[in-house]
UniProtKB/Swiss-Prot annotation:
Catalytic activity, as annotated: tRNA(Cys) + L-cysteine + ATP = L-cysteinyl-tRNA(Cys) + AMP + diphosphate
Cofactor: binding details: Binds 1 zinc ion per subunit.
Residue ranges of the motif 'KMSKS' region: 269-273
Protein's recorded name: Cysteine--tRNA ligase
Location of the protein in the cell: Cytoplasm
Known EC number: 6.1.1.16
SMART domains the UniProt entry points to: DALR_2
Motif stretch ('HIGH' region): 29-39
GO molecular function: ATP binding; cysteine-tRNA ligase activity; zinc ion binding
Catalytic EC class: ligase
Zinc keyword on record: yes
Stored InterPro entries: Cys-tRNA-ligase (IPR015803), Cys-tRNA-synt_Ia_DALR (IPR015273), Cys-tRNA/MSH_ligase (IPR024909), Rossmann-like_a/b/a_fold (IPR014729), tRNA-synt_1_cat_dom (IPR032678), tRNAsynth_Ia_anticodon-bd (IPR009080)
């Protein structure tokens, strides 16, 4: 298994800290709004990593957090007259619904930052005791990055590069010093009583503490195998996580760092400030979650994905082929490539080379269909063909529906009954040699984007886009 390590900037063999086990921490969302396509892409990318590792024989522990203490949450909660707990719970539920629709496997653990305040306070106390952290006059606590000789080694940033995004405070020793603890500022603020005084943790300390509490291994030079997230988190978030872990515990946070690429909308980076965020829940109104997942996984995880609906519909044809084959093998069978599972898994073991994996999949679908055409009555390989399709489901998380359910997506139960009645009416017309009426019914359904196919087992139908 090979993965691209952001820190070393090269593809390297995956060699876990404990043989045949992999522990992964993925930065989850700050829950002040619904999930957008960038959140979905990150979740799917590292869901693919998890599935690939599991099918390669690893026991995987994957933790993905919820940041439920943050300035954005506080500001929105005040605006909507809600508590931060009430607001964050709404968006945690929304995020979970969206990821379920995208067939993302549930993490081993989903810690909330608010559940690990004691661990955060303890880590900050350790940094204060080591004289690596310092207070300013308003009570806030910062980390002195000059005490970490490796600061910037992950993201290749240094003090001459724009640190303005971190926020300038006059009493900070260096521009890149970052906040560990924000003291309580008054009625419109949120604070928790602690040995540090009333206040709340900074963003970066939250993830480091949750890594330590949920995954960290003892007596190793690294706490975990893989730390992952979107490329927008590389700096300052992941850089600062790595820094404070080295400073507090004397070890590196992760042996490997993995980052997925941005999602662009019409060739512009998707962001709330540009007003072009595309929420998952809105995309799911138009497209089934499996269709959306299939599209988002179709571009290599490290590349930028430029979202457009035309490409989404093109990618849907791949799903159509999977279900068309599944539909066929449930009735009549042919031979397949016996090395298919090995070949497609090897592609994914090469830094999640999904483009190559999808090419192997396309070849399998085409060759199997050709063999079915040549020998439609051969039933000897039914189990093997269905096992290969099951393997695709487990590896890529697509192709898990019943074919009839897939091809009839977006059709209500009342519409289905109406279509079945029309098919029965057409059947009677054909029996009575009234072919004009039969053709008229077919055309009527076609105009409603319903295609009919006559098979030896009877007429079947599907909805097309």
């Amino acid at each position: 298994m090979f993965i691209y390590d952001t820190k070393s900037k090269q593809k390297v063999p995956f060699e876990p800290l404990v043989k045949n086990k992999a522990n992964i921490y993925v930065c989850g969302p700050t829950v002040y709004d619904d999930a957008h396509l960038g959140h979905a892409r990150s979740a799917i990318a590292f869901d693919l990593l998890r599935r690939t590792l599991e099918l390669s024989g690893y026991e995987v522990m994957l933790v993905r957090n919820f940041t439920d203490i943050d300035d954005k949450i506080i500001n929105k909660a005040l605006k909507e007259n809600k508590s931060i707990q009430e607001l964050s719970s709404i968006y945690i539920e929304s995020y979970t619904r969206d990821l379920n629709a995208l067939n993302v496997k549930k993490p081993s653990l989903e810690p909330k930052a608010s559940e690990y305040l004691d661990a955060m306070v303890h880590m900050i106390e350790t940094l204060l005791e080591k004289n690596i952290a310092y207070r300013v006059s308003n009570g806030d606590i910062y980390l002195d990055t000059s005490k970490d000789k490796d600061y910037g080694s992950l993201s290749v940033h240094n003090s001459s590069i724009e640190f303005g995004r971190i926020g300038l405070v006059q009493e900070k020793r260096l521009e890149q010093d970052f906040v560990l603890w924000k003291s309580y500022k008054g009625d419109n603020d949120v604070g928790f009583d602690s040995p540090l005084g009333k206040g709340r943790p900074g963003w970066h300390i939250e993830c480091s503490s949750m890594v330590f509490e949920t995954l960290a291994l003892a007596n190793t030079p690294y706490q975990i195998d893989i730390h992952a997230g979107g490329s927008d988190l590389l700096f300052p978030h992941h850089e600062n996580e790595a820094c404070q872990t080295r400073c507090a515990f004397g070890v590196e946070l992760a042996k490997y760092w993995m980052h997925n690429g941005f999602v662009n909308i019409n060739n512009e980076k998707m962001s709330k400030s540009l007003g072009n965020s595309f929420f998952v829940k809105d995309a799911l109104k138009n497209y089934d979650g499996e269709i959306l997942r299939n599209y988002l996984l179709g571009v290599h995880y490290r590349s930028v994905l430029n979202f457009n609906e035309e490409d989404l519909l093109v990618s849907k044809k791949r799903l159509d082929k999977i279900y068309r084959l599944k539909q066929r093998v449930l009735g009549t069978l042919g031979g397949i490539n016996p090395n298919f599972k090995k070949e497609i898994l090897e592609c994914m073991q090469d830094d999640l080379n999904v483009s190559k994996a999808l090419s192997v999949l396309e070849n399998m679908l085409s060759s199997t269909n050709e063999k079915l055409d040549q020998n439609p009555k051969n039933k000897a390989l039914k189990g093997e063909i269905l096992a290969n399709l099951k393997f695709v489901e487990e590896l890529l998380g697509i192709g898990f529906k019943d074919p009839s359910a897939y091809f009839q997506l977006g059709v209500s139960e009342s519409e289905k009954q109406e279509i079945e009645n029309k098919i029965e009416e057409r059947k009677r017309a054909k029996e009575q040699k009234d072919f004009l009426k039969a053709d008229r019914i077919r055309e009527e359904l076609l105009n409603r984007k319903i295609a009919l196919m006559d098979t030896p087992q009877g007429t079947i139908w599907e909805k097309f886009f």
